[in-house]
Amino acid sequence: MTIHQGGNSVIDNVPYSLNTNVNDSIYSEKGTGRKDAEDHTPSKITDLEKNVDHSIPSFPENDPKNYSEFVNLNPPKRPDLEHTRGSSWHTASENVNDLAANDSTRVQTPEFITQTMEDENVEVPPLERDERDAAAAHTSKANRNSARQMWAQLMASVRKFKREDEKPILKENLPAINLFEAGIPASLPIAKHFIRDKSGQPVLPIITDLIKVSVLDVEPKHNRIHSTFTIQVEYGTGPHAIRWLIYRQLRDFINLHSHFLFFEFQHRFSGRRMKLPKFPKEVLPYLVKLRGYQKILYSNPSDQLIDETHSISDISWESHSQDGDRTTGQPRHANNGRKKHGNFWTIQGNTLGVYLQEMIHNLQFFPEVNVLYSFLEFSSLGLYLAGAGTFHGKEGFATLKRNYSPTQYMLCCNTTMMKTRSQPFWIIVSESCIILCDNMLSMQPADVFIWDVDFEITRKNFRKAHSKDTNEKIRLSHHSFKIKNRQKVMKLSVRSGRWLQQFINSVQVAQGLTAWCEIHRFDSFAPVRTNVAVQWMVDARDHMWNVSRAIKNAKRCIMIHGWWLSPELQMRRPYSMAHKWRIDRILNEKAHEGVMVYIMIYRNIDATIPIDSFHTKEHLQSLHPNIYVIRSPSHFRQNALFWAHHEKLVVVDDAITFIGGIDLCFGRYDTPQHILYDDKPVADKTGLCEQTWRGKDYSNARVHDFFDLTEPYKDMYDRLAVPRMGWHDVSMCIIGQPARDAARHFVQRWNYLIQCKKPARKTPLLIPPPDFTTDQLTDSQLTGTCEVQVLRSAGLWSLGLVDTVEQSIQNAYVTCIEKSEHFIYIENQFFVTSTTCEGTTIENRVGDALVERIIRAHKNNEKWRGVIMIPLLPGFEGQIDLQEGGSLRLIVECQYRSICHGEHSIFGRLNAKGIDGSKYLRFYGLRGWAHLGENHELVTEMIYVHAKILIADDRVAVIGSANINERSLLGNRDSEIAAVIRDTLTIDSKMDGKPYKVGKFAHTLRKRLMREHLGLETDVLEQREYNMDGLDRDTEWKRVEVWTPDEGNAINGSAYTAEELKMKYRSQSQFTTTPDILRKAEKSMKKLDQRVSLIPSSIEFNIKTQKDKVEFEKNYEKSKKGPDVIANALVGGIPLSLKTKEDSLYELSKFSQCGEDQRPMVLKDPDHLVPEPSRPHCGNGLVFYDDIPLLEVNPISGETIPKFDASSFEDPVCDEFFEDIWSKVASNNTTIYRHIFRCVPDDEMLTWESYNEWKKYGKRFKEEQARWRQEELSNLHETHEKSENDPKNPKAGSQGSGNTSASEDSKTEKPKTRTNNGLQVPDKRVVYDLLRGIRGQLVELPLKWMSTESNARNWLSSIDKIPPLEIYD
């Protein structure tokens, strides 16, 4: 044979049409006696070059016996070429290297032989013939060897072309976009839908051209049929291709081929032939040594399988031949007994990979291809989940033997739980759960088994009954296993122990990639997440605006979990300018766009809680099939007659979540000013002078609870007589990984409710979203500077937790109080803790933590303070002295027993230790006043504190839906959700006059709340500080040391400055506002009536015509549009750029590039800072004109009213702020409200007798105001002229300034009142002078109210004690 260093040999030009069986060989006849020719291993071309002198047999020149014997035993198979064998062979002295050097000579050999054959037909004289024969005898052997060599080369070329013809066409995978441009691949999934097997199941709709299979490794075993192959399956192209590993044994391939042989036999009778590829017999592990393979049991490192990055088309087919080297055509016997090169396991694996690829290609249009897809672990849902970037684990069939949950029997809700099923499920091991589907084609899970800290998977141990040998290996069950979490136990059975072990291994790998099975801080279900973007929002205006924007931008799914949801709620105001922002219209629009909407609400009992959840469900589900609503709990079925789902949660696209105390329902919308009246008409011709709280949104639960909710725009009260009750609340927006933690909580509850009671409408189970990767967060700019952990209260009835109750919210509250160094700030709807009331022990430990912390501060002589804000009265309907006020009295009793009444209260326990509790802990509430109706009647109403927050040391904050009572904190009653936030971005501040590092999130939130309560214009202040800050919260990912409370006494963890976090600064050139625009906005802001309208009064009168209205609406809509911003700026973070126009005040929004996030307020300009508000409002939420003096001295107490500004709130502990400003303002406001309105509750009201006297005073005060109005009407003309000429005496109620005839001197005489024969009503002048002395809405919580009656056990009636106390505490 000839080996060329370059180019092709002559016989390489044999036409492709020459097709010979690959087993044909001129040396294939039996009887050669060369057994080494039977044993062949593929060898590489480099090996042939090294051993070329052994590849061709040689014979002695003078040994005709050997020659003739060789010729006779190996005749050529081609008769037409038989005569071409020459007259002689090469001698032994000639080797292949010599032949290779004489290629040109051998090339001429055919012509020489042909000429000789022609000469034989010519008549030659005898003498010449003898001479000629003598000359030919000398070269006969060499010529014959040359012919034989030529024949071998010719046949090798024929085999080479035949192999190329038979080789499968294995193409490199093209990009998916190129495949779909062809048109045909895109139609294949649809076509496969119509191909169905005998059971009616369609073919899995996948594109086979995107599948690649390769064997990466082989684990040999002595029993070689049990060798395990590691197979990589790839679906897709490019960097987003989905890859996973499966493990199969050789017998699995044999079983697979046997199945398809049976299918092929069936298809013969149907007239449709199945082109089944032949099973590669060379992979069978028999006679490995005799067949010439290296007998090794482990892979040779120098002869590895193909790399996972190579496609199957890169496999060298020539290296797999058993007939010889298919590249060179070397005959098999030419090895001359040499052991063949190549690892059998490598060849076996690669050959099986090629076999699988052929199967995929040939069977793609047969219904039985699903058997092959199940062999490769394909499924519709598995591909969908893996395409989202999640972990893709083991898949396969398993039979459910038992599905047991103790809650299903404890709570009598076992109607929908699947106990067993003979039909096997398709099981998918995902990143943090195990999914059960009806089959591999299903996209809806039949059950979802979510992992938690108690998750475990076990196999039952068996020991032979007759064996007593303890050293004997315990035999494990080969088929059954059990999985367990906090909710239930499932027993499953699989087809083999191998499959089970693979399943367990896959679960263990997934567990190593997730943190859901670990114990977390505060014993929460969720881990601590770092580098999170968070933004707080105070009051529902900001919350609802941002929620509406997030829902509007939803792309995949919306999850809403609330106590109440009003479908007709207007998310933005005014109504006429934002009619499309009604929540049912937004959800309907998104559902038509394909977004899935899932809503969970509390299933109310109409007789006690009139929120009409049935109306909510029926209305929303009637809008679109993509909207699903579940009401819960089923009170009797789940044994939850008294408990409620109290979470307030919105999750959009598993990326952004809103957590707090605000429900999306009537009565919650409010602004920081907390205006108490809204008596304007519904709308005028322009649509601008209209109500802010329309219909049921104008509410006062203290007067009357909600009713007739099917008519949402029908008023419940007379607006001219009943003020609304202001609603103060706090929420936050979290972006990034904690949003997926909140979504996981929602999914867990959603699935549990479906299993407890099957909905009337088919409702899908949900799958928890996978965790974000660091790259996904940074690439999507979903990072921030906060450390966030989601918390919850959950138990048996609410989440099906067995043998455990999660109370991580209570743990966080207690830990933050215990670890605080200087200060805590709490706002909550209730305060019932750590006491004994009516023989019932209150168990939650918040009160205990406060007592212990105060005792430690007193012992160590530390200055530690606590501020607690709660409503002045619970928000329940009814008068305190009437029978229907029983619930009100019972909750008040629990609260005062927790705070100050009795030896078990906080102050009682501190007094027993000789500690004055008021030195460390203060309780406050909120109250406002307003004018109602045409008579401008003065009224007061409390502002309901509904927030649920805790701030410790201005470093950490807890925000959520949990109240401080037994229902919310114990975990086995109401279900709650919250989050603890610690900002690693620190700023310089002070505590007790000393420098102190504080977290920016908690510090700014605490200042924002305190400023609002003391009456400062918070919107303007936020804008002013925002312009001064100049930071863009676009941060790099930072490795953070989380706060671990068990390792220290302080709230510690990583803390960084803006420079250390590499935070960017906004460019000054981005601000284009001029000083003229600033002055214009300043002037307009002074006349901005924030009660009901967004339009400054200086512009409102100019909008008179329809044309003006259209122009205004155009500008308004335009102002809401802004460029997209990063997630940190989405809900009140710092935008990337700020731009304003000189011709529009409506683009001057609170957060610039979130044009739809906040109502228009003020402009932004770093060069000309927004001026600080010069004065707080006087309790009614409206700022007085600067030329109207405020009262500087309280005429009742004779004390100076504190002066303060925005900079006074930095240090909440120092006496200069806490005692001289905060506490004194609250005391001053309380005194003024007491003197004017005789409010309930109050510290001077100790008995029922005094309570009745104060009620009579309220009637007399109302009558007295009517008399004032009559006097005004009789002197209307004189009063009008006086109000125009005297700026210090504006019309009462016209701008909220009151109608007063105050002198230039702001001091007034101390008013006189009678208390012996009834309380005297002060005159008009005194009343309005006193109102000018109120600062903000902060008042003291009266701790002595009705204490005499409470101590005498005369506070609660016998009827009040009938209901269980657990309902209220």
Swiss-Prot record:
Activity regulation, free text: Activity is slightly stimulated by oleate.
Organism of this sequence: Schizosaccharomyces pombe (strain 972 / ATCC 24843)
Domain of life: Eukaryota
Subcellular location as annotated: Cytoplasm
Keywords from the UniProt entry: Cytoplasm, Hydrolase, Lipid degradation, Lipid metabolism, Meiosis, Repeat, Sporulation
Pfam families: PLDc
GO CC annotation: cytosol
Catalytic activity: a 1,2-diacyl-sn-glycero-3-phosphocholine + H2O = a 1,2-diacyl-sn-glycero-3-phosphate + choline + H(+)
Lineage: Eukaryota, Fungi, Dikarya, Ascomycota, Taphrinomycotina
SMART domains: PLDc, PX
Gene that this polypeptide is encoded by: pld1
EC number: 3.1.4.4
Comp. bias intervals (Polar residues): 1292-1303
InterPro entries documented for this protein: PLipase_D/transphosphatidylase (IPR001736), PLipase_D_euk (IPR016555), PLipase_D_fam (IPR015679), PX_dom (IPR001683)
Function comment: Required for meiosis and spore formation. Seems to be involved in the coordinate induction of late meiotic events.
Name under which the protein is recorded: Phospholipase D1
Limits of the PX domain: 208-379
Enzyme class: hydrolase
Annotated TM spans: none
GO molecular function: phosphatidylinositol-3-phosphate binding; phospholipase D activity
Family: Belongs to the phospholipase D family.
Region (Disordered): 27-90, 318-340, 1277-1320
Boundaries of every PLD phosphodiesterase domain copy: 641-668, 941-968
Biased composition, class Basic and acidic residues, residue ranges: 31-53, 1277-1289
Single Gene Ontology BP annotation: phosphatidylinositol-mediated signaling
